[in-house]
């Protein structure tokens, strides 16, 4: 276990599990370098080339969707608008990477025959079903990833060998927070603290070097209070910023302007705050010992149930995703976790004291990430294929190989 660089530490990922030197390299040089195929719990792979699903009569339609370089949440919003539905009438088993080619099931309430044309989105099949797709029906995802421009091949091989022995931390990965603008968790924490001014400051006054010049200019205008000019300057794809600014132009206060952002996006901010807290707690748990060896006070998952660890019980260590109603560990594990929460100025109750639709309940997430069927070939480029359980981030595995100091420059 070695200390991670400042960017990772800012996201709560304080450590690497492996102590190998950085391999370097670039992922996602093009979307086809990062393929994601959903795996259902019955083992069915929703493959890019197509999938066979047994239809069942009911009030839902399952759609096989392949998207290239398209944001999952924005796809759902666009699909709902095109079909004249509410966004809650469309469900997914999980959010997939944007800068990638991904294949998954999307379900729509009712019988759907005609689907809209959406750039970079293919609909490869649809089936009547008796229930919506849901996270509980998803085992995970199969990844096929190309790492180009590997600078130190021997370091890449050493890292992959080390991953077979190390207990890999199940961090929430870079894309949960952003690499060009790593602020999703900061926006979420501002919401949880009811800090409208802080939310505005993060949204418009924190400007990062890899943003486009158009975005930088628009943020500067907004930060100076020139809302109308900023609204005109932001490109149309900046949904959140434009929604907030439209309200400010009409004379709204900062909090109600923030509430104009689509609910699904506000929820992503809250979940990013939860993810950041989880990463910090997981890092603190790594300081107490290997993640594959429970210690006194740990919460563990045994046969699908979360309980407190007792000697000889076994089970997988889990760490709370902090929110309303979550149980905390005991003993020295609890002491370490309470210290983190105090430093962050957040209590589990804060997640319940939110407007309806933004309340977030706690859950539990396994402390270690276990890749299945890991295979690779190393020629001019490194090609990896592996399966991760639902919620696992491929970039968490890849960061152990590449060990980037500036993730964006490596394609993360």
From Swiss-Prot:
Gene3D superfamilies: 1.10.1510.30, 3.30.70.3160, TruD, catalytic domain (3.30.2350.20). Residues 167-370 form the TRUD domain. Its EC number is 5.4.99.27. Keywords: Isomerase, tRNA processing. Signal peptide: none annotated. GO terms for biological process: tRNA pseudouridine synthesis. The active site is at residue 97. It catalyses: uridine(13) in tRNA = pseudouridine(13) in tRNA. It holds the Pfam family TruD. SUPFAM superfamilies: Pseudouridine synthase. Belongs to the pseudouridine synthase TruD family. This is Probable tRNA pseudouridine synthase D. It comes from Pyrobaculum neutrophilum (strain DSM 2338 / JCM 9278 / NBRC 100436 / V24Sta). The lineage of its organism: Archaea, Thermoproteota, Thermoprotei, Thermoproteales, Thermoproteaceae.
């Amino acid at each position: 276990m070695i200390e991670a660089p400042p960017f990772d530490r800012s996201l709560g990922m304080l450590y690497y599990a492996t102590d190998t030197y950085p391999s370097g390299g670039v992922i996602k040089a093009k979307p086809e370098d990062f393929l994601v195929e959903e795996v259902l719990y019955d083992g069915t792979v929703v493959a890019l080339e197509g999938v066979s699903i047994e239809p069942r009569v009911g009030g839902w339609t399952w759609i096989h969707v392949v998207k290239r370089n398209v944001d999952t949440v924005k796809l759902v919003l666009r699909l709902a608008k095109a079909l004249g539905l509410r966004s809650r009438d469309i469900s997914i088993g999980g959010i997939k990477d944007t800068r990638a080619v991904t294949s998954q099931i999307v379900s729509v309430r009712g019988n759907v025959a005609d689907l809209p044309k959406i750039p970079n989105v293919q609909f490869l099949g649809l089936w009547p079903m008796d229930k919506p797709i849901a996270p509980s029906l998803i085992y995970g995802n199969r990844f096929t990833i190309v790492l180009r421009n590997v600078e130190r091949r021997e370091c890449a091989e050493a890292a992959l060998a080390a991953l077979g022995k190390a207990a890999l931390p199940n961090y929430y990965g870079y894309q949960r927070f952003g690499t060009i603008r790593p602020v999703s968790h900061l926006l979420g924490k501002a919401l949880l603290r009811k800090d409208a001014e802080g939310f505005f400051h993060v949204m418009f006054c924190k400007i990062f070097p890899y943003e486009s010049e158009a975005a930088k200019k628009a943020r500067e205008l907004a930060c100076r209070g020139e809302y109308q000019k900023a609204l005109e300057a932001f490109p149309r794809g900046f949904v959140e910023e434009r929604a907030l600014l439209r309200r400010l132009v009409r004379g709204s206060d900062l909090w109600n302007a923030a509430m104009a952002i689509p609910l699904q996006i506000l929820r992503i901010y809250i979940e990013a705050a939860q993810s950041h807290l989880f990463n910090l707690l997981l890092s603190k748990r790594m300081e107490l010992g290997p993640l594959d060896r429970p210690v006194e006070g740990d919460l563990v998952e045994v046969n699908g149930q979360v309980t407190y660890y007792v000697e000889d019980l076994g089970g997988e260590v889990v760490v709370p995703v902090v929110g309303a109603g979550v149980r905390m560990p005991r003993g020295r594990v609890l002491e370490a976790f309470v210290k983190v929460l105090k430093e962050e100025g957040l209590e589990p109750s804060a997640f319940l004291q939110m407007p309806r639709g933004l309340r977030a309940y706690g859950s539990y997430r396994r402390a270690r990430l276990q890749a299945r069927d890991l295979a690779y070939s190393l020629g001019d480029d490194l090609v990896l294929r592996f399966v991760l359980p639902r919620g696992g981030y491929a970039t968490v595995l890849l960061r152990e190989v590449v060990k980037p100091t500036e993730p964006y420059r490596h394609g993360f």
